[in-house]
A protein has these predicted regions:
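Conserved CoA-thioester-binding segment of acyl-CoA-metabolizing enzymes
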Residues: 1-57
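CoA-thioester-processing core
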Residues: 84-90, 98, 104-142
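Hydrophobic/aromatic residues within transmembrane alpha-helices
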Residues: 17, 54, 66, 110-112
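A short, glycine- and basic residue-enriched loop/turn
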Residues: 22-25, 59, 64, 102, ...
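Glycine- (often His-adjacent) and acidic-residue-rich active-site loop
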Residues: 41, 48, 56-90, 103, ...
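Hydrophobic alpha-helical membrane-association signature
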Residues: 32-35, 80, 110
Length: 142
């Protein structure tokens, strides 16, 4: 399947999902979440895949949720932040986060759910939602 907000590649026994919204710092919108969920399901179902690598295009791994969608989808977004981390945690295959820049909010939650994080010297991790009076939704502070 062709995706719009992620790049999903398989080579040999390795799958790579690249969050691909560099103009939005790879912020997670509804479409990106749905595409990621579908690709992760394919990774789980494909017996030839032995490991999954998650990364981001441009200057970010994932800069959290797309706050432009908060006004209409607050409860949906909160549920799906948890769900993305749960999807990563429940995969039966090892998941590596290759963090190449900003890894914030929901992106940090996704990375923390991985089995291994490899971070470049430019990687920056954080939970900026606390500055908005919002508790990190994916459980990263619990």
């Amino acid at each position: 399947m062709a995706y719009e907000n992620i790049i999903y590649e398989k080579q040999d026994n390795i799958a790579v999902i690249t969050f691909n919204r560099p103009e939005a710092m790879n912020a997670l919108n509804i479409k990106t979440r749905a595409e990621f969920t579908e690709a992760a399901r394919d990774v789980e179902d494909d017996d030839t895949i032995k490991v999954l690598i998650l990364t981001g295009s441009g200057k970010s791994f994932v800069a959290g949720s797309d706050i432009k969608e908060f006004h209409a989808t607050t409860s949906f977004m909160a549920h799906n932040i948890v769900r993305l981390g749960s999807i990563v945690e429940k995969l039966s295959k090892p998941v590596i986060a290759a963090v190449n820049g900003f890894c914030l909010g929901g992106g940090c939650e996704i990375a923390m759910a991985c089995d291994l994080i490899i971070a470049s010297e430019k990687a920056k991790f954080g939970q900026p939602e606390i500055n908005l009076g919002i508790i990190p939704g994916g459980g990263g502070t619990q």
